[in-house]
Amino acid sequence: DIIGTIPSMYAGALSFLERNLKHVQNGQNFNTQGELEVSKIALEEIVQNSLTHRDYTKNAPIRLLIFDDRIEIISPGVLPNSLTIEGIKMGNAVVRNNLISSFSTKILNYRGLGSGIIRAIRNQPNLELYNDKVGEQFIVKIPRM
């Protein structure tokens, strides 16, 4: 379990993902550490979004799951109001947690409302977004190499 303040949970989540994902050479020298098998920028944006925009009225944790073929980041709660997957891909946003969103600009690598999903997709074009209304959760799936 990753618990604590939002900045410590953010750092803990990224640390967990980086420790448990492969690093690949991608043409680098033999002795280099290599690059993460998926976009680190996309992971940062998705983890940040999951902490900032999750539904805190749901008594459920954010889940970070690593499978052989994919990574899943699951946030409690569906997209708020009339927000859709297509809309967030275009930068549309609805603030669910006003106080957390306002502090995110100061405590995280927050780049502005509505820009995170666009940036994640630009850096990891094959990621998939699911607004699971039955399970009341938002799921991001990132295929692995």
Positions of predicted regions on the chain:
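Conserved beta-strand-loop-beta-strand hairpin that lines the nucleotide-binding pocket
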Residues: 1-11, 38-145
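Helix-loop-beta hinge of the Bergerat
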Residues: 1-36
